């Protein structure tokens, strides 16, 4: 019984301790909320400089128009030393930050300290506030608000458009497969390292926790690299080249081992994924929400309406062909007639040989009806169906100098001459005037 009471007392003490750590401590170290919060308003094209911790707020003064689809509003903070920047939605959030909280105290150490940062403001946000906290008293910083066309948003929109309309072609391209694999390998090298280490670990090891940590570390490292890319390229370019070479080669090796996608279902999944990413990029890059939704819907309908348009066009062609009057057939020339006759004759003779050589052919019945069985057997074995004498007679009669052609030519000429012959006119004899 005493043990139960003692255990309850320990649990109660632990709960009180956690409550004191998480909840605000107004009696110990709470800043006075009655003190008025000093906030500096930010205006477009105006820069302010300070050397102490301040609170800044920007309030929207105009409604976004259709011409602001790729317009960007950003707050740039540049300082001589490291600072801590926190973005909130309104002034009430700033007042809450002024109140000491143990959870906020520990989480503030996880916030990134930067000396040059950009904060992007939503065009539809009524108010955006920023708190700048100095870690060193001897620090000067400047805050500027700017608005204008962002070429990066337009580039992202074009990339989304390309991925959506050419997703099928890209999903089947080997160049896209290898380039995407190498790029993903360079950006997620930490995750790939964690995956390789998981293969060496026992099956009961906490791999999923390690994988989650790898994702978090990879995202954090990628964020740091992109924010400090210019400094890295100028100061540590040797290490950057070595890193890109090693990681790029390893990524290419992995892509080469597994090879491009060949299964049609896998290609379709990649195609749908690229199209979905393209729609998301188009939606994110356009700052006006209703215009973004309209563009996404139009792009989707345009892509899907391709098949109904093809079906309608095919149906229209069929209806048009049925209703159209048949035109006069084109007559063959003499050369085309001879070629076609030769081809069709050879084809018919081959079919006749195959029919006579088939097991179902009544050979004895056929031989009993023909006059020259030996000639028929030679024909079935591949010999010509005409004798040299028959060929000579045919050429003599129907060749270029044959009698049939001469009769046709001279017969036509005689008919023409007969038609052209005109009887001489008969004039009446005039009477004598005498």
From Swiss-Prot:
It holds the Pfam family NEMP. Interacts with banf1-a and banf1-b. Interacts with ran-gtp. This is Nuclear envelope integral membrane protein 1b. Residues 326-395 are annotated as: B. Residues 1-29 form the signal peptide. The transmembrane domains are required and sufficient for its oligomerization. Belongs to the NEMP family. One of its GO terms (biological process) is eye development. Residues 326-434 are annotated as: Interaction with banf1-a and banf1-b. It is found in: Nucleus inner membrane; Nucleus envelope. GO terms for cellular component: nuclear envelope; nuclear inner membrane. Residues 176-287 are annotated as: A. Disruption phenotype: Morpholino knockdown results in defects in eye development, reduced expression of early eye marker genes rax, tbx3, six3 and pax6 and reduction of cell density at the neurula stage. Co-knockdown of nemp1b and ran elicits reduction of cell density and eye defects more significantly than the individual knockdown of either one. In concert with ran, required for proper eye development. May be involved in the expression of early eye marker genes. Contributes to nuclear envelope stiffness in germ cells. Required for fertility. Essential for normal erythropoiesis. Required for efficient nuclear envelope opening and enucleation during the late stages of erythroblast maturation. Keywords: Developmental protein, Erythrocyte maturation, Membrane, Nucleus, Signal, Transmembrane, Transmembrane helix. Its main location: nucleus. Phosphorylated. InterPro entries: NEMP_fam. Residues 368-375 are annotated as: BAF-binding site (BBS). A motif (Nuclear localization signal) lies at residues 317-325. The lineage of its organism: Eukaryota, Metazoa, Chordata, Craniata, Vertebrata. It comes from the Eukaryota. It is a multi-pass membrane protein.
């Amino acid at each position: 019984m005493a043990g139960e009471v003692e255990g309850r007392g320990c649990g109660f003490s632990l709960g009180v301790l956690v409550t004191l750590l998480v909840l605000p401590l107004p009696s110990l170290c709470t800043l006075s909320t009655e003190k008025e919060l000093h906030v500096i308003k930010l205006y477009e094209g105006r820069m302010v400089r300070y050397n102490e911790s301040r609170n800044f707020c920007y309030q929207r003064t105009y409604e976004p128009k259709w011409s602001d689809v790729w317009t960007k509003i950003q707050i740039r903070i540049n300082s001589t030393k490291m600072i801590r920047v926190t973005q909130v939605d309104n002034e009430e959030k700033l007042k809450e930050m002024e109140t000491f909280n143990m959870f906020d105290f520990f989480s503030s150490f996880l916030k990134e300290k930067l000396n040059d940062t950009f904060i992007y403001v939503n065009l539809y946000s009524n108010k955006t506030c920023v708190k700048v906290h100095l870690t060193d008293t001897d620090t000067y910083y400047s805050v500027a608000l700017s608005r204008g066309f962002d070429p990066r948003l337009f580039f992202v929109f074009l990339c989304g458009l390309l991925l959506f309309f050419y997703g099928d072609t890209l999903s089947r391209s080997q160049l896209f497969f290898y380039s995407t694999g190498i790029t993903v390998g360079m950006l997620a090298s930490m995750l790939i390292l964690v995956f390789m280490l998981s293969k060496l670990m026992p099956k009961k090891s906490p791999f999923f926790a390690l994988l989650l940590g790898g994702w978090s570390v990879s995202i954090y490292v990628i964020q740091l690299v992109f924010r400090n890319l210019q400094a890295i390229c100028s100061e540590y370019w040797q290490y950057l080249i070595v890193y890109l070479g090693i990681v790029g080669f390893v990524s290419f090796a992995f892509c080469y081992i597994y090879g491009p996608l060949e299964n049609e279902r896998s290609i379709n999944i990649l195609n749908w994924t690229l199209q979905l990413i393209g729609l998301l990029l188009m939606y994110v890059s356009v700052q006006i929400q209703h215009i973004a939704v309209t563009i996404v819907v139009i792009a989707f309908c345009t892509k899907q309406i391709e098949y109904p348009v093809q079906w309608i066009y095919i149906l229209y062609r069929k209806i048009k062909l049925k209703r159209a009057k048949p035109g006069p057939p084109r007559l063959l020339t003499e050369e085309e007639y001879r070629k076609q006759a030769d081809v069709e004759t050879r084809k018919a003779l081959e079919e006749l040989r195959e029919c006579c050589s088939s097991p179902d052919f009544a050979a004895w019945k056929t031989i009993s009806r023909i006059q020259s069985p030996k000639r028929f057997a030679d024909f079935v074995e591949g010999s010509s169906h005409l004798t040299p004498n028959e060929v000579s007679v045919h050429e003599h009669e129907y060749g270029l100098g044959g009698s049939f052609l001469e009769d046709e030519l001279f017969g036509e000429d005689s008919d023409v001459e007969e038609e052209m012959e005109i009887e001489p006119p008969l004039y009446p004899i005039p009477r004598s005037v005498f």
